[in-house]
C-alpha cells in the first residue's frame, strides 16, 4: 500500500513555521502529522539546556518485512532570515517556477521530498527511519548526537543513511558527498605585562610573541591532499588585544584560527601541534581547541552506487563523488553505518530569497524513491 503526498505542499507547510535554530515545537508538529498516517511511529525528544538548548529531535520508524533498514537524516532548524527579502521568509510563495522561503533548500524541501518518496514506497518493502534534528545550524551539541543516543537505546540502527543536505552545485544530481573534512577551531592566548609604551622595560609586550607564533603556524604545510580529499588548510580568523589606548602595552594578545583537515589527521593531534609551536615561543601561552568533527569517508561502494544510479535514472547526470565543503551532521552519523549526503542545489542556501525550483522538488522525490526501491528490491 502506498499514499500520495505532494512535496510542494508539505515543503510550504514546513517553511511556514519559523524554526530558527534551535528549533522546537510547531515545525515538528507539521512533520509528525505528515508521517503518522504513513505508518511511522514517531518519537520526539527535548534535549539539552541553555545556552545551547533546549533542542527538539524526532525519530520516526516504519518497520517493514524486508531485511534492509534505510535511514534518512536531516534538520528542521534554519539560519536567521535577515532583512531584505522580497517576501516574508516564513510565508512560502511560488513565483514563476520557484518556491521561496527560508529552508526551501536547506533543508525543509529535501525533508518534504523524502516523506513523499517514503509515502510512495510499499510499507512492507523494508524499514525506513527518519532522523530529524532541530539543531544542525547551531552548536549541534544536543542535536543529532543526542538523537543517536536515543536511537541506540531503542536499537534503531539503519544499514545505510542518506543525509538530505543541499549537495548539488549547478544542477540537481551533479554532486554527492561521500565524506567531509574535519574541523577544529583553536584559540591562542599570550600573556604579557601591561605598561606604558615609554617604559617598555617595565612591561612585557605579548604582541611580538603572538606574531612569531602565528608566523610559525603560517609556515606549516599540513599535507598535499589525499585520494579523496583536498589539502588541509589553516586559516587565521581573529586577532584581538582589547587595547583602545595608543600609549599602553596590552596585558595579553589573543588569536583564533580554524583548521579544515583531511583523513591524514585527527583533531586532537592538530591542537597538540599548535600548542607545541606556541610554547616554543612562549611557554606561558594558553591554547584551547574545539573539535567540531573529524574527517570521515564512506568509500565508494553499494550506497554511493545505488544513489548514483537513482540520480542517473531521473536526470541522466553522472554524479561526482566529492568530499568538498563544510561540515554536516554526517560527521556524527558515519559512526553508525555508511553515510552519503545528497539533496537540492545549494546556490541560495543561507541567502536572501532562498528558493528551490518546483521541478527539482519533484525530481528529488523521484530520486529518493528510486534510492529506496534499489535498497529494498
From Swiss-Prot:
The record's annotation in Pfam families points to:
M20_dimer, Peptidase_M20
GO-annotated biological processes? diaminopimelate biosynthetic process; L-arginine biosynthetic process; lysine biosynthetic process via diaminopimelate
Q: Work out whether the entry's keyword set contains Ubl conjugation.
A: no
Q: What class of enzyme is it?
A: hydrolase
State the CDD domains in the record: M20_DapE_proteobac
Cofactor: how and how many bound? Binds 2 Zn(2+) or Co(2+) ions per subunit.
Top-level lineage group: Bacteria
Pathway(s) per entry:
Amino-acid biosynthesis; L-lysine biosynthesis via DAP pathway; LL-2,6-diaminopimelate from (S)-tetrahydrodipicolinate (succinylase route): step 3/3
State the UniProt keywords alphabetically.
Amino-acid biosynthesis, Cobalt, Diaminopimelate biosynthesis, Hydrolase, Lysine biosynthesis, Metal-binding, Zinc
Q: Hydrolase among the record's keywords? A: yes
UniProt-annotated binding residues for Zn(2+) 2: 106, 137, 350
What does the record give as cofactor?
Answer: Zn(2+); Co(2+)
What PANTHER family is this protein classified in?
A: ACETYLORNITHINE DEACETYLASE, N-ACETYL-L-CITRULLINE DEACETYLASE
The free-text function statement in the UniProt record for this protein reads:
Catalyzes the hydrolysis of N-succinyl-L,L-diaminopimelic acid (SDAP), forming succinate and LL-2,6-diaminopimelate (DAP), an intermediate involved in the bacterial biosynthesis of lysine and meso-diaminopimelic acid, an essential component of bacterial cell walls.
Its family?
Belongs to the peptidase M20A family. DapE subfamily.
Q: What is this protein called?
A: Succinyl-diaminopimelate desuccinylase
Query: Species lineage, top-down?
Result: Bacteria, Pseudomonadati, Pseudomonadota, Alphaproteobacteria, Sphingomonadales
Q: Which gene encodes it?
A: dapE
Amino acid at each position: 500500500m502506498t499514499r500520495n503526498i505532494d512535496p510542494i505542499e508539505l515543503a510550504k507547510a514546513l517553511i511556514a513555521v519559523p524554526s530558527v535554530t534551535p528549533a522546537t515545537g510547531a515545525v515538528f508538529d507539521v512533520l509528525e502529522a505528515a508521517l503518522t498516517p504513513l505508518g511511522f511511529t514517531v518519537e520526539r525528544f527535548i534535549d539539552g539546556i541553555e545556552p545551547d538548548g533546549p533542542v527538539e529531535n524526532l525519530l520516526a520508524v516504519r518497520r517493514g518485512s524486508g531485511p534492509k533498514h534505510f535511514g534518512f537524516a536531516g534538520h528542521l532548524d534554519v539560519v536567521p532570515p535577515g532583512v531584505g527579502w522580497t517576501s516574508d521568509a516564513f510565508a512560502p510563495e511560488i513565483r514563476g517556477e520557484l518556491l521561496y522561503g527560508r529552508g526551501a533548500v536547506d533543508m525543509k524541501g529535501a525533508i518534504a521530498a523524502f516523506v513523499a518518496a517514503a509515502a510512495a514506497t510499499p510499507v512492507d518493502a523494508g524499514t525506513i527511519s527518519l532522523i530529524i534534528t532541530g539543531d544542525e545550524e547551531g552548536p549541534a551539541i544536543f542535536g543529532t548526537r543526542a538523537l543517536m543516543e536515543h536511537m541506540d537505546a531503542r536499537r534503531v540502527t539503519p544499514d545505510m543513511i542518506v543525509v538530505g543536505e543541499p549537495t548539488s552545485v549547478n544542477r540537481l544530481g551533479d554532486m554527492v558527498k561521500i565524506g567531509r573534512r574535519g574541523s577544529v577551531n583553536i584559540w591562542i592566548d599570550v600573556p604579557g605585562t601591561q605598561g606604558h609604551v615609554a617604559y617598555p622595560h617595565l612591561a612585557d609586550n605579548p604582541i611580538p610573541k603572538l606574531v612569531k607564533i602565528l608566523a610559525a603556524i603560517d609556515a606549516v604545510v599540513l599535507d598535499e591532499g589525499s585520494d579523496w580529499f583536498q589539502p588541509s588548510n589553516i586559516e587565521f580568523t581573529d586577532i584581538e588585544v582589547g587595547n583602545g589606548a595608543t600609549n599602553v602595552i596590552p596585558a595579553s594578545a589573543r588569536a583564533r584560527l580554524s583548521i579544515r583537515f583531511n583523513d591524514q589527521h585527527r583533531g586532537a593531534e592538530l591542537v597538540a601541534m599548535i600548542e607545541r609551536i606556541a610554547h616554543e615561543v612562549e611557554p606561558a601561552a594558553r591554547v584551547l581547541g574545539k573539535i567540531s568533527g573529524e574527517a570521515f569517508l564512506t568509500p565508494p561502494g553499494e550506497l554511493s552506487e545505488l544513489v548514483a544510479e537513482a540520480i542517473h535514472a531521473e536526470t541522466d547526470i553522472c554524479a561526482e563523488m566529492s568530499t568538498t565543503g563544510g561540515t554536516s551532521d554526517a560527521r556524527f552519523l558515519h559512526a553508525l553505518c555508511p553515510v552519503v549526503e545528497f539533496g537540492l542545489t545549494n546556490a541560495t542556501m543561507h541567502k536572501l530569497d532562498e528558493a528551490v525550483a518546483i521541478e527539482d522538488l519533484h525530481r528529488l522525490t523521484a530520486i529518493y524513491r528510486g534510492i529506496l526501491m534499489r535498497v529494498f528490491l
